[in-house]
Amino acid sequence: MKKVLSVCAVLVFALSCIFAQSISEKSEERKTLTVYAYDTFCGDWGVAGSVIPAFEKATGIKVNLVAAGASVEAINKVRLEGANTRCDVIVGVSDDIADKAYDLLEAYNSPYLETIDQSLRFDKENRLIPYDYGTFAFVYDSESGINPPQSLMALTMEEYRDKVILIDPRTSSVGAGLLMWTYNALGDGWKDWWKTMSANALTIASGWSAGYGLFTEGEAPIVISYTTSPIYHVMYENTTRYQALLFTDGHEATIEAAGIIKGTKHRSEAESFIDFLLTDAQIDLANANSMYPVNSTIELPEAYDYAPVPGKIFTTSADKTSELINQWTETIAK
């Protein structure tokens, strides 16, 4: 009898352990969030070192941050993975490539949407929630000795041969932004500009991280980036060496957003993450990404004085962006 009781006790203990482990695993599952982001969001220059730890501390939710390449590559990764994707939230989807992601996302009417200016809320269905914005610009190395160009067409001149780094519109939101910029500024001449620059530029990088890395390594003194890019160098390197150029053509605007993936099993955690981006993380996001916060009440550091403000700004719809990328692929990327 004692042996039977002993065996039963062991069985009860074992089942209790299994049950406790199951509960623990479920609890852990509820407290985990997988976020896909473009590489620089996850890297040394990005948000991983500040925003993610702060979110984890504030909420108790563990974030699995996945560097998925450039923004378009991150979208494509989710699409290719289909129902098997681990992704709960995708960040870094800009307004000019938004139509590539809409069908992958669930709407979320965050209570903090009211802090965002209506002009920045490009998705009326709230599948993509803006968290920062800026304008594209060419950044140059003021110690390189070159004469800084003042327009898009100036870049096609022989004196800038092999001195400019561009980015591919098919794989990067920065490249897509440059494409829209040339279209809005040059009209029908945008194709000729790209044909000339394809030969004149040092390279057309696959993403911003690769392109800007080549620039800071001294491979070329000019790179496509943002008017706000000098902020990083002022804040973290204490240098004004790298400066954004204001062109007479005007500049293309961009808005970065995050969205919740359809079918996520961590909807509550995903909502908490989006809300955090719109509140506590706003200044850290702006500083880490060298962009402007969407919440206009945020007080900006003095380093933002080094970001020039364009007098003329363009915006382009996502469907037009897709159309032009197709044309670019057919005529330029042959």
Model-derived segments and spans:
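A bilobed periplasmic-binding-protein/Venus flytrap-type ligand-binding module shared by bacterial periplasmic
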Residues: 137-144, 183, 254-269, 285
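An extracytoplasmic/periplasmic, membrane-proximal ligand-sensing/linker region
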Residues: 190, 296-334
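Extracytoplasmic ligand-binding site segments that recognize negatively charged/polar headgroups
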Residues: 34-48, 69-73, 85-220
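A ligand-binding cleft/hinge motif common to bilobed small-molecule-binding domains
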Residues: 96-100, 216, 220-241
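Periplasmic-binding protein-like
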Residues: 134, 162-171, 195-198, 204-205, 237-262, 276-299
